[in-house]
Regions:
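Conserved core of the PLP fold type I
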Residues: 1-115, 127-147
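Active-site glycine-centered loops adjacent to acidic/histidine catalytic or metal-binding residues
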Residues: 122, 149
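Hydrophobic residues in beta-strands of the RecA-like P-loop NTPase core, especially within AAA+ ATPase
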Residues: 38, 120-121
Length: 149
C-alpha cells in the first residue's frame, strides 16, 4: 500500500501512461498461449502491447451498451482454462467511442468478481465528461479484482 485516502487503502504505481501500463501488465500476466479477453473491437495499442507475449486473444461480444456479461462469463473459462484477464475501455471506448452503461458495468463487474477474472480497466478518456458526471468505474465496483489505468 502506498497511500490511504478517506479510510480506503489504495495501491498505486506511477508510470508514463496507460500504454506503458499495458506493456508492464502484458509482461507480468501473459505467458505464451494464455488467453486474454478483449472487447470487439478493441484498442489497437493494447493488442500491440499484448502480442509480443504470444497470447490467444479472444473477443467478447459487445453492443451499444458495452461488453455482453453473459458472453464474458462463458469466455472467462475456469481452472487451467481460465483467461488471464479481460481488457476493457468502459468510457469513450477506442475505436467505437461508446460508453458502457451503468447496468452493463454492474453486470460485468459482478461476473468478473464471481468467476475471479481480473479486469484491466483502461480509462484514458475519463476526463472528457463535460455535461454530466462520469459513471462509476469498474474498479469502484470490484476494487480487489481490477487494475485501473
Amino acid at each position: 500500500m502506498i497511500c490511504e485516502v478517506r479510510g480506503q487503502r489504495l495501491h498505486h504505481a506511477a508510470g508514463a501512461g496507460s500504454q506503458q501500463g499495458l506493456d508492464l501488465i502484458a509482461k507480468v500476466l501473459i505467458d505464451e498461449g494464455s488467453r486474454v479477453l478483449v472487447e470487439t473491437p478493441t484498442y489497437l495499442g493494447a493488442l500491440q502491447a499484448f502480442s509480443p507475449m504470444e497470447p490467444e486473444i479472444v473477443s467478447v461480444a459487445s453492443d451499444d451498451e458495452g461488453v455482453d456479461a453473459a458472453d464474458l462469463r462463458i469466455k472467462a473459462g475456469s481452472g487451467a482454462d481460465a483467461a488471464r484477464f479481460v481488457y476493457l475501455l468502459p468510457n469513450f471506448q477506442n475505436p467505437t467511442g461508446r460508453t458502457m452503461t451503468e447496468a452493463r458495468r454492474a453486470a460485468v463487474a459482478a461476473v468478473a468478481a464471481e468467476v475471479g477474472l481480473p479486469v484491466i480497466e483502461d480509462n484514458p478518456y475519463g476526463d472528457l465528461w463535460f455535461d454530466a458526471p462520469p459513471p462509476a468505474s469498474l474498479a469502484s465496483r470490484n476494487p480487489e479484482g481490477t487494475l485501473y489505468l
